[in-house]
Amino acid sequence: MNKDMCVACDDGILNIRVGAIIMKDGKILMVGNDRDYLYSVGGRVKFGETAEEAVVREVFEETGVQMEIDRLGFVHENYFYGDAPSNRNKLIYEISLIFYMKVPDAFAPVSESFMEGSSKEHLVWVSLDEDIPMYPQFFKTELKNPTNMIKHFTTDERSPSAPRSAGRQRPSR
């Protein structure tokens, strides 16, 4: 079995991740656990997988539903400090490719919860206007008016003076 594209480096951890944008009735499907924030459906790319294969696999693992990709929406470079027991306070540089998914009309997750390693996670439908912390944070603004552009965002939480989020875009191909 191929391993997750997660590499321990001298100064931190490098993650290659995919995320899925699953929108229905003006809400987005997000994942939560015992922390006080939500994050996108998705996970790490496995060595030997393409990002497209990884996002389809992750969506199926987390929802039990096979979905097709609509298009690549975002490239997100993210520097942050880990908060899980395995990476607590370690600097993580994560590169995420985030895809809009084609959501079937009758879509409903097979289960509202699933196990990720040893932690239990749950799926939540959230309005972008709800006052709930979610990551990536740019979802709250960018998903209200989606475009056919591939947008690139960089989030840097290494220090209070570091730029929090910056973005640029280019046409989707």
List where the protein language model places each region.
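Conserved Nudix-box catalytic region and its N-terminal flanking loop in Nudix hydrolases
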Residues: 24-62
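Active-site-adjacent beta-strand/loop module that shapes the phosphate/pyrophosphate-binding cleft
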Residues: 80-110
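Acidic, metal-coordinating catalytic segment for phosphate/diphosphate chemistry
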Residues: 1-19, 25, 89
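Conserved hydrophobic "DFG−1" position in protein kinase catalytic cores
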Residues: 22-23, 30, 101, 125
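NUDIX/MutT-family hydrolases
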Residues: 100, 110-146
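Charged phosphate-binding loop/patch that engages nucleotide di/tri-phosphates or the phosphate backbone
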Residues: 134-173
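A generic structural micro-feature
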Residues: 12-14, 87-95, 115-120
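A short coil-to-beta-strand element that immediately follows conserved catalytic motifs
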Residues: 66-75
